[in-house]
Amino acid sequence: MSRAANRRPGLSAGQLAAATASPLLSLLLLLACCADACRGTPISPQRLPPEQELQLWNEIPEACASFLSVDSQPQASVALRKLCRVLMEIFQKPQEQTEKDNAKRFLFHYSKTQKLGNSNVVSSVVHPLLQLVPQLHERRMKRYKVNEYQGPVAPSGGFFLFRPRNGKRSTSFI
């Protein structure tokens, strides 16, 4: 038998390549036409009510925890175990973040001075120099009260009525 007899009658090598490329080209053309219409992830038209969605999100960590705790499931795939571990990490991260936020709020709240009645009780978290602020304020208020009693013409606190500005001296005021 010759080689020509072993060949399938009907399609030559060029025709066979063109026949297999034709569906591929038509598929690519179809995808190119539809690419502009798809601009995001598909959204399910049947959304769950918020209560059921919250319940589902609460059940996921419980199911993963029970799945990972049971060692009697050797037939479970490694990929499924990894998925459960990733989900458990995702659900634990927001809890850790809220714990950090609560600690920051606690420290900020108790770093302020606490006033009980007439006495000022300063927390030990406050910087020692910040404890001097009330004393400085009291000194300034005393100085202000002393300056009130002195008249505007009389020298008070080292200032006089017509003082030179910007280093300039006026002969009429000396």
Swiss-Prot record:
Propeptide section residues: 38-105, 170-174
Pfam family membership, one: NMU
Modified residues (Methionine sulfoxide): 141
Tissue distribution: Expressed throughout the gastrointestinal tract with highest levels in the duodenum and jejunum. Low levels in spinal cord, hypothalamus, and stomach. Neuromedin-U-23: Expressed in the small intestine and the pituitary gland (at protein level). Neuromedin precursor-related peptides: Expressed in pituitary gland and small intestine (at protein level).
Record-linked SMART domains: NMU (SM00084)
PANTHER family associated with the record: NEUROMEDIN-U
Protein name stated in the entry: Neuromedin-U
Name of the gene this protein is made from: Nmu
